[in-house]
Amino acid sequence: MSVSTHLYAPEGMGRRPAAFLRLVFAIMLAVTVASARAVNAPPLPQRVIELAPNLKVQGGGELTFFGISVYDGYYWSPARGWAQDGPFALDLHYHRALDGAKIAERSVGEITRLGYGTAEQRSRWGDEMKRVFPDVRRGDRITGVNLPGGVVRYFLNGNSIGDIADPGFARAFFGIWLDPKSSQLDFRQLLLGEKP
């Protein structure tokens, strides 16, 4: 007795079941990889833990630009969601070298697109970011920590590199990734743990 099995593709797929199954498998693998990133987030630097000891990773993922990997990001918070006034951290692990001034300029562009602040405030925030943001190399890690009172403290590879103290700036800066109108909605969902 012989048993024969056939794979049938959905209506309209013709005779391409193997291609269909490969596509389904690739999608499942991509979702698994994205989920694993959040679970396997590297621990926060010790100095960050000392500032905000109750943070837990909520999600994470990879940000790409036209298919080029820019960085892996992780969102750390005591609870789910974006608690704008509470302590939280955004931890970025860079895959490529980037100029600190260009990072600041891109950030101002995103803040402007989101509608935060006045032109004068955005200009001041841009100057502050240029003062604090270093050039990054592949493998560098920048962690931004939102502290009570609207202070954002930045760390490069675990070492403090500067603060920007302005509640409006804190909301605007973290809004680049966490605002519901972010230009990177898929990445936002990964950071907040809303997308597996």
Predicted segments with their positions:
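Bacterial N-terminal signal peptides
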Residues: R22-T32
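Terminal leader/tail segments of proteins
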Residues: A36-P196
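Short, intrinsically disordered low-complexity segments
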Residues: G14-R15, L21, A36, F187
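N-terminal secretory signal peptides that target proteins for export/translocation
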Residues: M1-A19
